Amino acid sequence: MPGPLNGIKVVEFTEIIAGPLAGMLLADMGAEVIKIEPPWGDPWRLIQSFSQTESRPFLAYNRGKKSLTLDITTPQASDIIEKLILEADVVIANYRPDVAVKLGVDYTTLYKINPALIYCENTAFGRKGPDANRPGYDIIIQAMSGLMASEGKLSGESPEHISSSPMIDTTSGFCLAWTICGALFARERTGKGQMIETTLMGTALMLLGSRISQVESMDFFSRRDTVESLSAMRQAGVPFKDLIEIYQEEHPPTSGTMYYRAYQTKDNAIAIGCLSDPLRKRLLNILN
């Protein structure tokens, strides 16, 4: 049975995780996705590889696609790209903004070829600002956004990054696919394509959610004092480990955390998630 995106053509200028995951999700929904790779391949092919050109991570984010080897830095590539773009509905790119322009696969250039194109660009920090042309990986954005520190976990004396999965890259991939589907729906109504911008930093801030949202009447003074105090100690060279301990002493866990955590029991570890009063009462009854 054809998927909901059957007939949609996607050209993908991406590598590693966020962009490739978005393309894979669109392919899962029936789109024809053509991944453009340089002659040496997506770097992800070489991570945990089981052959000269394949790896588990690469397969995990690139199933269901067609692959085209093309050195887009050469003049000969421009004709091939133009033919692809003329027939494309969507382009996904995750280069730095300056790199996309240099390679001639930026929105302004491709719009001239196909004005109905939906162009989705994922960068680390966005197109404007002092960090616009800086590269960024999941771990860098974890650190800069505060996501890493918010976990309050240590690896020795340093903050421990979230390593079980590339959280920011993965969530960004879903955001890319989600916004592309929205743009395709808008084009059905208006006939117009558009440019979409997503960023790793924006994704990280979204994931932080209530940790960075502020209700002025409740949070302003308490958070201001905490931030000023911790900032002063950090500038004075207080180790991160000590900062975490100070923060946790001043902000003890709420009563709700006992109902949403893991416990070691006599025979095994268990995880409990009881966020509502009815569930908490049932848990208390079970525990007698």
Predicted feature locations:
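N-terminal helix-loop segment corresponding to the beta1-alpha1 unit
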Residues: M1-R189
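Acidic, glycine-rich segments within the central catalytic cores of soluble metabolic enzymes
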Residues: M144, M148-N288
